[in-house]
Amino acid sequence: MNPTRGAVGGTDPRPAAVVLLSGGLDSATVLAIANQQGFACHALSFRYGQRHEVELAAARRVASALGVVRHVVVDIDLGVFGGSALTDPTIAVPAAGTAEEIPVTYVPARNTIFLSFGLALAETAGAWDVFIGASSVDYSGYPDCRPEYLAAYQAMANLATKATVSGERTLSVHAPLMHLSKADTIRLGLSLGVDYGLTHSCYDPGPDGRPCGRCDSCSLRERGFTEVGVPDPAGG
């Protein structure tokens, strides 16, 4: 096992992993899972042209609370391409249950782009494991959250970098929430000590950062906490 070099020097004997951290409920749970599995976690977040900074503030809170080797925030403006209500303020965020097929909150190729940054960070950090909070249960219908997509991405990743083609090891893309409902995810996170009051899930928060309570993400979150039988500490 190779030690992981930390952000401020020194070494960490744990194996390194990259965790994509949006600041939402799912990615916070995944960071807790990776920690529990014994990884030294490099959290990776993105300022990608989204409407608000509140999710990045949440990501910073979660990274600090759960403990990471370092937290990298990458600036990349996906809004220049348009095509999503999350990056284009002229496109309204639909209320839960009103979207047909793939909703306008889908950001074109977002997970492919984010995972590719994660792949680059993994190579430089000496990590062979990348974690993402994708789920095919209780989700908004995005094509890049499906298990077949992530399997294909992992296969590509192992053909794509100096580290993987050297034959020393293979890289694994982990989606530990893939087959969990939102309620099951919350139960798991609570058992691992996740403070969901630090997280943010809303697609269309108000100027003060408060969740809208009407978008698909708010609806899924509310239903999850209701099924678990505990109040949402974030008030969403």
UniProtKB/Swiss-Prot annotation:
One of its GO terms (biological process) is queuosine biosynthetic process. Its EC number is 6.3.4.20. Gene3D superfamilies: HUPs (3.40.50.620). Pathway: Purine metabolism; 7-cyano-7-deazaguanine biosynthesis. Its cofactor is Zn(2+). Coiled coil: none annotated. Keywords: ATP-binding, Ligase, Metal-binding, Nucleotide-binding, Queuosine biosynthesis, Zinc. Transmembrane segments: none annotated. It catalyses: 7-carboxy-7-deazaguanine + NH4(+) + ATP = 7-cyano-7-deazaguanine + ADP + phosphate + H2O + H(+). The keyword DNA-binding does not apply. The keyword Ligase applies. Binds 1 zinc ion per subunit. InterPro entries: QueC, Rossmann-like_a/b/a_fold. It comes from the Bacteria. GO terms for molecular function: ATP binding; ligase activity, forming carbon-nitrogen bonds; zinc ion binding. It is an enzyme of class 6 (ligase). NCBIfam families: 7-cyano-7-deazaguanine synthase QueC (TIGR00364). Belongs to the QueC family. This is 7-cyano-7-deazaguanine synthase. It comes from Frankia casuarinae (strain DSM 45818 / CECT 9043 / HFP020203 / CcI3). The gene is queC.
